[in-house]
């Protein structure tokens, strides 16, 4: 009986040792991102590690490096989304790293559905081509909800949808579906993106 008790205690201690680093890791990972948009205001995004852990971490890493500071929303479409994160500003650029696409078509279950306020990764035809470009859905249109399973949603705007709406209203490309804003002076600029602690 004594031997069994000792073994149980040892097993319990081992389990606690294994779980502690995992718990600490979850507590320390960045969960909220603040984006200050020049002339518009602040957007606060809550990252979703449960549905898109690789994508959320990649985004947080880029934010911590200051990657997004000074970049613009180069593609803005009414009743669809605003897209940014391209250092070239052409829709063709990205960071030096590409990540696995965390969406159903690529074999990954992602239960964060595209709807107004959801933040998702842009990509090319290659499922694993997402890098730094992201978009924020600005409506619940069929164009938006139809993205489920095809793109990796990884966060949601919890404050600042009025900012997203203002950007949409003032810089939309009404007749340029799929294009980019050619007049760079009209683009909304990310003044600063940073990791924050957030309390309601």
Spans of features found by a protein language model:
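Sec-dependent N-terminal signal peptides of Gram-positive bacterial secreted proteins and lipoproteins
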Residues: 4-26
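Cyclophilin-like peptidyl-prolyl cis-trans isomerases
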Residues: 18-200
């Amino acid at each position: 009986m004594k031997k069994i008790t000792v073994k149980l205690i040892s097993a319990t201690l081992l389990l606690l040792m294994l779980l502690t680093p995992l718990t600490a890791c979850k507590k320390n990972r960045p969960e909220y991102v603040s984006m200050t948009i020049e002339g518009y205001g602040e957007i606060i995004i809550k990252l979703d590690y449960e549905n898109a852990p690789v994508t959320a971490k990649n985004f947080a890493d880029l934010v911590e490096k200051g990657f997004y500071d000074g970049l613009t929303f180069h593609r803005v479409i009414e009743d669809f989304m605003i897209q940014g994160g391209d250092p070239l500003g052409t829709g063709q650029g990205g960071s030096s790293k590409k990540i696995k696409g965390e969406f159903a078509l690529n074999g990954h279950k992602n239960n964060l559905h595209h709807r107004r306020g959801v933040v998702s990764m842009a990509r090319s035809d290659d499922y694993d081509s997402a890098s730094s470009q992201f978009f924020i859905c600005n409506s619940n249109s069929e164009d938006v909800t139809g993205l489920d399973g095809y793109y990796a949603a990884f966060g949601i705007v919890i404050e600042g949808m009025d900012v997203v709406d203002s950007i949409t209203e003032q810089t939309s490309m009404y007749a340029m579906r799929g294009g980019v804003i050619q007049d760079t002076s009209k683009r909304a600029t990310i003044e600063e993106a940073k990791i924050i602690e957030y309390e309601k």
